[in-house]
Amino acid sequence: MMNAPDWLRLFPEADYRLSMGLRPGNAGRFWSDWDSEGRLAAERSRWLAESAADYQGCLPEAGDAVREARSWMAGYSQAPEPDWVLLSPDPHEEPHVIAGEVVFPSSWALADKLGQPMSSVHAPVPGLQVQMGAGIRTFLAKIEPDSAWERENWGLAADDELNHHPKRSLPRLGRHSQPKTTWIRLEHQFLTRLPKSGGLLFGIRVTCHRLDLVTQVPEVRARIQRALSTLPEPLARYKGLHECRHLLA
């Protein structure tokens, strides 16, 4: 079951800055089923049945690691709800994407990332490589087998659809956006190292929360306003907020 987001932790009382924001995680909580009615698993199956090639990918050398990853996830759920990406195992080289199943992406496609090193995966995010690239690589190299780490990443969206694959061309936020028609798109992320292959397993869950309801708490509203108003312009454009953040803040 999903815990309510800790909005005060996600939006600290400070100007916006890129941050890893990692903390010790709980594999059982993250990978066990959150949706007791099975709707999330059903939607996942529907998209995969429609076009699996858009959401799944695997390099030839990744077969053993993928089998290990699927077996590991099956220890928590027979139909895992999170998306997942598998990174190469060598701690002495920059990890690159070797496999995954990403049904609910935030405006990116797994096929475009397959085979790429993390520096290339993160390259579209303004400032990330300069500010955090070295720290990310060091952290990934030090992850121990069966350890668990979690973080969140937030964005805003014009709908509460989970599947934001770029091929869908969904409506975007713009100059007429309002809080009641805007959702916080929250990515819950998980990292561990598989014990046999050494591959890095990266899990992603997406939840959507209507902005006007979240900001009913005055302190939360003030912190979100501060984050939006201090978001650097290149990042605001990357997140699709450059035309509307003053309306939403």
List each model region and its residues.
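Extended, well-ordered protein cores
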Residues: 1-249
